[in-house]
Design a protein with these regions (language model features):
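Short, solvent-exposed beta-strand-terminating loops
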Residues: 51-74, 122, 237-257
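Non-catalytic positions within long, well-ordered alpha-helices that form the structural scaffold/packing
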Residues: 28-29, 110, 185, 292
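Well-ordered, non-membrane alpha-helical segments in soluble/globular domains
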Residues: 17-26, 76-77, 92-105, 138-151, ...
Length: 327
């Protein structure tokens, strides 16, 4: 099992290490990490992030994309207010912009020599993140996702493991085995499996009270996954107990009468979603039970911290929860 941490090529991540490859390597060694899972690989520079430490790549996630993909201009204008805002969000006006972006990321991942790539099959509109009255079903999102993925991978020369990561928005949630089989059977790329994000699965239950209960919930859901459990190659390990917050937001939204006017690029929306999924560490040693149950090839500490010091604190907290060194 490789123990990894999430890292991106964005300045806010790399400036913590002074854009210095040695400082990044030293940090990984200090915390017994085998490498990183890299976000935004297109901006990768080997002088900062040596190939040997990049074990996985997290492909771009467009939270709101289905109407853009389907060319639904009316719905896009309702959400974004103007086509200029749409173009800014997607960096173009044609679905081909998404296809080409993913192809560039995959080509970079292949050049780096990454062992796996993570892809979210999910969609949510901003208003739906407040009231949970979703515009599309899991099946509709997955149908479009399969179409997108097949176009992205058409003709690409790579054999990196493609791992579908569960979300709590419509799409692949890891709650429906048939959806998982559909992805496996209809995505025309042979080397594929799943990435279990623990917090995302926790977010599908708004009544979890503590980490022990959450771990049991995750294990029960994975048991229902049956034989597909063996295709869970990695775990994004982080904790989310935000059910009370979500329930309060749903109640508040249902009681409001004014028209919803936040757009997908709003800072308020970003902070709202972060309150739902805050990427905090596990603190209870039941986390070890989960790792022993899944037996992943990749264990990624997917944590979000405001400083290097806080990140170290989070890693050490989760190490204690996992009793990692005895596994």
């Amino acid at each position: 099992m490789l123990k990894l941490m999430n890292l991106s090529t964005y300045s806010y991540d790399l400036e913590r290490f002074d854009f210095d490859s040695q400082k990044i390597t030293d940090f990984l060694e200090k915390h017994y990490m085998n490498g990183v899972e890299l976000l935004n690989p297109i901006m990768w520079e080997e002088k900062i992030l040596p190939k040997k430490i990049v074990k996985g790549v997290h492909l771009k996630y467009y939270p709101t994309w289905l109407d853009f993909w389907n060319g639904n201009r009316r719905s896009l204008l309702k959400q974004f207010k103007s086509m200029d805002a749409v173009e800014k969000y997607y960096e173009g006006i044609s679905r081909d912009i998404m296809i080409q972006h993913y192809r560039k990321e995959i080509e970079t991942a292949t050049k780096i020599g990454a062992e796996y790539m993570v892809f979210h099959v999910a969609h949510v509109e901003v208003e739906d993140t407040y009231d949970y009255k979703f515009a599309y079903s899991d099946a509709e999102v997955v149908e479009a996702g399969i179409d997108l993925i097949n176009q992205v991978f058409s003709g690409i020369d790579t054999n990196i493991k493609l791992l579908f990561e569960n979300m709590w928005w419509p799409g692949f949630t890891m709650l429906d085995k048939n959806i998982a089989f559909k992805l496996l059977n209809r995505v025309e790329y042979p080397n594929k499996g799943f990435m279990l994000d623990t917090a995302h699965l926790m977010n599908t239950n708004l009544y979890l009270k503590d980490e022990k209960e959450a771990v049991e919930y995750i294990i029960n859901r994975v048991e229902e996954f049956g034989e597909l459990k063996n295709l869970i190659k990695g775990i994004h390990l982080n904790c989310s107990l935000s059910g009370e917050y979500v329930r309060s937001q749903i109640k508040k939204k249902n009681e409001e009468s004014e028209e919803f006017d936040l757009n997908p690029m709003s800072e308020e929306v970003f902070m709202h979603v972060f309150k739902i999924d805050s990427h905090k560490p596990f603190t209870d040693n039941s986390a070890r039970k989960l790792i022993e149950f899944i037996k992943p090839e990749y264990l990624i500490y997917e944590l979000v911290a405001s400083s290097t010091g806080e990140l170290e604190e989070y890693i050490e907290t989760q190490d204690r929860a996992c009793n990692f060194y005895d596994i």
